[in-house]
Amino acid sequence: MSHGLPTAARLICVCALGALLLAPAANADLRVGAADDHPKSSPEVAARFYDAMKDVGMTENRITLLWDSAHPTTITGQENLAAAIRAADADGVRVTLDIYPSKAKALTESRVAPGRFAAFAAEVARTFPTVKDFIIGNEPNKSRFWQPQFNANRSRAACSAYEPVLAASYDALKSVDKSITVVGVGLGPRGTDNPLAPGNLSISPVRCIHDIGLTYRRSKRTKPIMDALSYHPYPNASTDKLDAGYAWPNAGIPDLARIKQAVWDAFHGTGQPTFEEAGMPNGPARTLKLRLNEVGWQVSIPPANRSAYFGKESVVTTDEGTQAAVYGNLIPILACDPSVESVLFFNLVDEANLDRWQSGLMRADWTKRPSYSIVKGAIAAGQTRCTGRRVAWRHDYRPVGVHLNFLGGSRRRSDRNKFWSFVAGSEEGTRYTAGLYRARRPGRVAPTLRALIARSLRTVRMRGAVLRSRGKLVGGWDKVIQFPTKRLKPGYYVYGATVVAEMNAARKATYVGRPFAVVRR
């Protein structure tokens, strides 16, 4: 059966994905690779696997290594892992080892477990001295890999508990070799933040980063805990387009600025570097890199290849042509983000169990999908080097995407009216304090009144406000902000509101509308 590339996959359109593209082209090439454990199977499989990687032009493979808390010093499958690393070294493939516990509760059951885990990571580094990249943990924001996600009082637990594990592992690995790159988190792209969610206890990536940063600050640590951040920007569904993304506080490939902002909110002004910023002095404080260590769009299996698989598909899939177009598009996009070091496709070769992952460039029978030739062509064409304008990210000082639809201007309201409200929204979670104030005249609000409103909104009593309201805005959703019912005397009034970012109280802004008239009817 032919598996030719459909027209949709041939017409590759590189989208901006909402990023700000201003600065000159980047210098460093994007590393493209795979996140695949196939090389551990046998030397023969490893040789075949790395031959395919070299043919595509891939240069990095992430391999997982599970830590068994019952045997804390044992490197499980050491012989096969050593063979896989030797084969990679011989073929010039960079190996990244991802070390995480085999049991979700392994690092929280015992006070000594984090120290034992860090010691294990150091021993692995000594055992495999050619490996210079280590990821600590895997998706601690998901209950499949870390438990508990929440405390008994329903507060978030997982990411706060993860921070000391990362810190201890950082110190242990650096004691072996200072040139080792310690990669943090391996963060999943979505979470419910709901301690009562049936079957899906998870924490969103933005809130996970916040909790890691809060624990770091409370520890009074002055050293970094990671040299790079590992992120897994899977789509919400494999039928999503590349530019679909997520609503805050989750994040996909189009939302990487959200992750960078979360890191800045969590760590700015500490010993942990944040991401490079356009137009800023990018010294030691802004050297953190982003590694997209798992990316994949799952596809349906052609009938001709179905015999290589078993089980039943458990998710909605896309077609192979669409997958190829997505994979081809994302390489030049990510190449123009100076913070992104690498993108690894999960997997290079499909898992045979249909209840697992089928997002590879090759099917389980090792036949090539259209995405294989598309990715190979993109790398050969030099699309791993930015040829356009690179992403010029800078952190926000204010809440992101705030909009308020105040009543004002020429609109008049009757003095018989008792209902007062306006519509507000923001792109991230925020808290608001809003008030309705008397104004002397229509038109532009005088600076003195604007300053008075701003001061009032910063106080608990909101002195001078005729009506008051407080609450939260959910990121990505508009809300009708309602005030207590009350009839107002004829005159001029104006709305004011202060909005504060949920993740960083220092990011706040005050907004004042235009005066409107209340007239006697």
Where are these regions (language model features)?
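Glycine-centered tight-turn motifs at strand-turn-strand junctions
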Residues: 442-491
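Aromatic-rich peripheral "rim/lid" segments of glycoside hydrolase catalytic domains that contact
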Residues: 44, 72, 140, 144-145, ...
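Noncatalytic carbohydrate-binding groove/subsite architecture in carbohydrate-active enzymes
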Residues: 43-46, 113-118, 157-317
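Structural beta-strand segments of beta-rich domains
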Residues: 416-422
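Bacterial N-terminal signal peptides
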Residues: 11-23
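Substrate-binding cleft and catalytic face of glycoside hydrolase catalytic domains
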Residues: 53-199, 236, 348-351
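Boundary/entry segment of secreted carbohydrate-active catalytic domains
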Residues: 28-60, 64-66
